[in-house]
Amino acid sequence: MVQLYYGSDTQNTHRVVQETILPLFKRAGVAVHDKLIPELCDNDWRDHDFFVLGVPTWYYGELQSDWEAYFDHFKTIDFKGKTVALFGLGDQWGYDEWFIDGVGILAEALIANGAELVCPWPTKGYDFQKSRALKNAGEFYGLALDEDNQYDLTHSRCEAWVKLVVAELDSRLTSIPLAV
């Protein structure tokens, strides 16, 4: 089962998770357990191996408030043997120097603590100046969504990215619990 953990202040991330990402996983036959960041406990990380993490970026490259409050603890978690796919929301035109920096902030901590990051996303089709979320010149560490300027692309981007995540699961697991 996939564990999907995320934070959301304005409900944009929550809406994308509930109305788009979770239904896409269900349609693919993948069981997903979702939780908001304030609901997490240490067992949520210890007892599972495959995670999808969602983070909107705020203001000038800052973490969303739940992630910000949790981040000092997050940086202490041992992610060796854990697989993580990331997605983030940001505003590539209004905050073009910090586009989805939250993804990069999480990625840095995850890599430092042994996680394997999967399902990077191409930078093609975005217009921004800088981002901490860049894995390399052509890829973000995870899916980049812009509900402010490219909301019309959210569903198709999520659809393509969820297919990548499902393929990654298929390559790792002998059986995926089916959604009920």
Residue ranges of predicted features:
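Short acidic/polar alpha-helix capping motifs at helix-coil junctions
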Residues: 4-6, 35-38, 70-73
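A structural signal for isolated positions on well-ordered beta-strands in alpha/beta enzyme cores
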Residues: 1-3, 33, 85, 118
